[in-house]
């Protein structure tokens, strides 16, 4: 006999949900999906749908992070440099104030 979803449970996704409006919403949805999957209460089909939705959300989040990184590069130009140990030691000092 096929396993039925519990009353009130919504399937994690069938691939037709629109993408969230922003990174934070996508991350929150992804965390919810992970918690549901780790809970072990999802059917095999729902687990697969949740995995697919999660993969879509991860790709969306990566894309959003890349966009922001590109914007930071444009704003900072070529001044982005790896943080050195000497720079970290002076971060606590506020000479400009």
From Swiss-Prot:
Instruction: List localization entries.
Output: Cytoplasm
Recorded family membership: Belongs to the XseB family.
Primary role: Bidirectionally degrades single-stranded DNA into large acid-insoluble oligonucleotides, which are then degraded further into small acid-soluble oligonucleotides.
Q: Which GO terms describe its biological process?
A: DNA catabolic process
Q: What is its EC number?
A: 3.1.11.6
Its assembly, as annotated, is: Heterooligomer composed of large and small subunits.
Q: Where is this region: Disordered?
A: 1-22
Q: Which organism is it from?
A: Burkholderia cenocepacia (strain HI2424)
Protein's name according to its UniProt entry: Exodeoxyribonuclease 7 small subunit
């Amino acid at each position: 006999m096929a396993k039925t979803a519990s009353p009130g449970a919504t399937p994690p996704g069938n691939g037709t949900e629109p993408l969230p409006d922003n990174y934070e919403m996508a991350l929150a949805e992804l965390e919810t999906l992970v918690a549901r999957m780790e809970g072990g209460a999802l059917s095999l089909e729902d687990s697969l749908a949740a995995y697919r939705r999660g993969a879509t959300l991860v790709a969306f989040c990566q894309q959003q992070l890349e966009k922001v990184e590109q914007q930071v590069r444009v704003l900072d130009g070529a001044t982005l440099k790896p943080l050195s140990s000497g720079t970290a030691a002076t971060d606590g000092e506020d000479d400009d104030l």
